[in-house]
Structures are given as structure tokens and as C-alpha cells.
Amino acid sequence: MDNSILYVNACVRKASRTERLAKKLLERLGAPFEEIRLEELEFPGVNEAYLQRRDQLLSSGEHQDALFDLARQFSRAETVVIAAPYWDLSFPAALKQYLEQITVVGITFRYSEGGVPVSLCRAKRLFYVTTAGGLYVPEEFGFGYVKALAQGYFGIPDVKKIEADGLDLYGADAEAIMTSAEEALACIRPIADAQPGAEPFSLIPALMTAADIGEKNE
């Protein structure tokens, strides 16, 4: 589907603030989306038998096997939105399992003769949406990991983090912080306006933070 959005939802709470912010982003993008709720998936256990089967399927070129359904789905998306709350310096474990499932040679990337990953994905934009109760949110284990994988393997040039933090600090007005984060989405280009060549993509991803917007977001 043209202008398709893949929405990868790693949230688990019914009143998830991350999910709330992600839904506002989807409204802003203004295109149909397909949602994956990671809590509803049963990821296979990674053991020797699983790895042997996976390697056998890949070596024989059986990329249509159900084991690679998630990878094929990801490779077809033109825009990706990942909603992942900030947990323990990173993100929920289910997201790591998902990323392992979609990182498949011959589907989402291939290796060049020099051993360099080359993208097989269609996506040009990926949004990583997250919220945090505190302010100490180092990005290298969460967004930084997703960014490196998205750009280095999947060839997605435009990777942005959309966040709201400090929500649970003493005296914080969580609703005001959320509202500011939602209002800041006005600077995101809707899908209909994001035509190829309309805006140059940098290999260094843009990072949408409170510093860029002038207010604290989550």
C-alpha cells in the first residue's frame, strides 16, 4: 500500500502515555497504518534448534516462510512509528525480540561484496516515540540502538525521537508536559507532504527533543 505506515506498539499499560503521544503522531501523519501490538505476539524461543531452522531457511532462499512474516511486513512499510516507553535505560524486552525477528538477510537487508549492510527496505522515515517519568534518559541503549539499526541495516535515513520526560517528578504538571509534546508535533510533515525530494535526508538523524522545541516533552 502506498504511503503505508507500520505502527510498532511496545506499550502495555491501558493508560500508556507513550501510546497517547504515538496516536497523536499517527493523526498528524494522516495516512492509514497497520498496528502490531508486541504484547500480543508470541516470539519463538531462541535456541540452537531455532537458529538451525532459521539458517536453513535462509540458505535455501525460503524467505516466504511464516518465520519471516514480520520482516517482510517491515520491509514493505514506507514509514515506521515505534512506540516504546523508557524502561531501565532502554525499552521493553518485546521490542528487542521484534527487532531480532525483522533483521533478516535477504529481506530487510543484504550484504555487499565488501560485507557492508545494504538496505532492502522501503521506509524513508522512522519515528521513535517514548515517554519517561524522570529526566535521566540516556539514549544510547534505547533510541540510539534503534537509530543505529534503522540507518545502518535498514537504510532509513530520517530517524527522529519524539519524547516527553519528567512526567513523574515532584510538582510536575504531567498533563501540561504531554500537551506541549502533542502540540510540538505540528512541525512533523504529514505523509501527503513528504514527497521524495521535498526535504533532504541526512545520514545523521534529526533528534526532536525539548531543546529543539523549547519546552520539555515526553
Ranges and model annotations:
Residues 104-114:
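Conserved nucleotide-sugar donor-interacting segment of glycosyltransferase catalytic cores
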Residues 1-104, 183-218:
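N-terminal beta1-alpha1-beta2 submodule of the flavodoxin-like/Rossmannoid cofactor-binding fold
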Residues 137, 144-218:
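Glycine-rich phosphate/pyrophosphate-binding loop and the adjoining helix
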Residues 112-154:
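Short, glycine-/small-residue-rich phosphate/pyrophosphate-handling segment
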Residues 44, 90-91, 136-138, 170:
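Short acidic/glycine-rich loop or secondary-structure boundary segments that cap or lie
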Residues 99-102, 106, 130, 154:
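Short, well-ordered alpha-helical segments in soluble proteins
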Residues 11-14, 133-137, 167-168:
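Short histidine/acidic/glycine/proline-rich micro-motifs that form metal-
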Residues 36, 129, 162:
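Hydrophobic residues at beta-strand termini and immediately following loops
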